[in-house]
A protein has these predicted regions:
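Structural signature of hydrophobic alpha-helical transmembrane segments
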Residues: 40-53, 100-115, 136-138, 163-166
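Helix-adjacent hinge/juxtasegments
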Residues: 72, 76, 80-110
Length: 190
């Protein structure tokens, strides 16, 4: 019939696992770098752009389509955080334009402090989701941002913030794996 629209079933899996894998890999390697396990930041920046940034933003966009405002917002803004953080670290090298001055420690302290506040507000919302591991991931993410702020304020050693970031990454990887396992009927506590 003319003017008739057919809607196909768009049921799909949750993109949240991809977002948590993105956070997990990027945070794990950033944590290891900050703990002094290696000194080459190239791989960490690549992880931050591709997995931390793009994977989380794409997961967020897909969650917007599913009507999941919390998941969409969290993955999208934190994905853009990884992209912004990468730009801040690459801009002084002149990769995108003429070399720029490196961000000052105080500016980075306030940058990470603001993200810690936003993460904490989102953590409150996780209490209503009903998945305890999501709350755990957000709590350690809060601690990651606040510990990085303290590093940039000059009151906390970078290695401690690195350890907290590593824990964030590992918790996020566990959650991502649990979501995937659960989707195929394997029970994993989360």
């Amino acid at each position: 019939m003319e003017g008739e629209v057919t809607i196909k079933d768009t049921t799909a899996g949750s993109p949240a696992a991809v977002g948590f894998y993105g956070l997990g890999f990027a945070a794990t390697f950033a944590g290891l770098l900050n703990m002094g396990m290696f000194s080459d930041a190239t791989m960490v920046i690549a992880m931050a752009i591709t997995l931390g940034g793009l994977a989380e933003v794409l997961a967020g966009i897909q969650l917007f389509k599913k009507g999941d405002t919390f998941g969409a917002t969290a993955f999208t803004i934190f994905g853009f955080w990884w992209l912004a953080f990468s730009y801040i670290n690459l801009a002084p090298a002149g990769l995108f334009n003429a070399p720029m001055a490196a961000a000052s420690a105080p500016s980075m302290a306030y940058f990470t402090l603001m993200w810690g506040i936003i993460a904490t507000l989102l953590t409150i919302a996780t209490l209503k989701i009903g998945v305890k591991m999501i709350t755990v991931v957000f709590i350690v993410l809060d601690l990651t941002f606040f510990s990085l702020a303290l590093v940039f304020f000059g009151v906390l050693p970078l290695g401690i913030a690195g350890l907290i970031t590593l824990v964030t990454g590992l918790c996020s990887l566990y959650l991502a794996n649990a979501l995937v396992m659960s989707s195929v009927g394997i029970k994993v506590p989360f």
